[in-house]
Amino acid sequence: MGSHCPLVSPSVGMISAGRQDYQKFFMCRLLGYLGQPLRPEQLIYRPEHSLIVQSYQPQEMTAGLLNADGFGLGWFDQESLPNPYLYKNVLPIWSDINLPHLSRYIQSSCFVSYVRSATPPLAVDLTNCQPFTEEGLLFVHNGFINNFRTTLYRPLRNLLSDASYQFIHGTTDSEHIFALILDNLRRLRQTSPGDSDWAKTSLGKALEASLLTLVELARQHDTFFSANILLADGQRIVACRYASRQPEPSLYWLANSERCPGGVIVASEPLFADQKWQACPSQSILVINSPEAIAVKVLANSVA
């Protein structure tokens, strides 16, 4: 079987009003897993439309042809929670000679991975390479803020706490979005100190609050953004598929498949042909606490 997944139809039309706005932006590809311990190479390398294949032959990118500006893998070890591990490189993922061995050695019940297609003029260096990690979280982002340096760069930084401001080491809009999420997460911790279900709901709430802030900032500064995000804390993954102007980048999920029993996969594109792949709805947040506990929340429509 080839790398194309014929049983799954694209969730986003490739021709639409406003598509020309996206031509100068490049989209990354994301992958997340939660479930029974799994070697990352089983999703990064083995499937017919694996993350490796998506790096050079993506099927549903709204712009760009290659994801060759670096990659990253972040994973949790149950014995070392809540501190995740990272492996990143600015090489194209297919050029790294260590990742095949590392991804075959690791076993993890929660990991995320990413291949990058950098938006010019952002630098291709390790500080800009995802996943980002802070406070026991892993973060990957596929999307952009239009004209970030001249639109939301200063407004976003002005909103951040000192801790989140100092956390930023690179120049990407992605890292600034993560910093905003961290601040919202800290506020939730302060307001819900005795909530036993706090951990199950806080990541989704912090992500939603951050998206609403971005919507308002984009409106104020006459710009737009897209944000497909994966957040993981080792016990759960929270994802979103969101854009303030269509089309949104593609995002899918699959639970308890024959090829991956006891697990949930979230990916920019289906890794293999399976009728059970589900496209995340537009403007939605996906909260995965286990393969049997998955919730989808569609946010109020704010697309321009």
UniProtKB/Swiss-Prot annotation:
Signal peptide positions on this chain: none
Keyword Transferase: yes
Protein keywords: Glutamine amidotransferase, Transferase
E.C. designation(s): 2.4.2.-
Active site: C28
Protein name: Putative glutamine amidotransferase slr0199
The species this protein was found in: Synechocystis sp. (strain ATCC 27184 / PCC 6803 / Kazusa)
An annotated GO BP: ergothioneine biosynthetic process
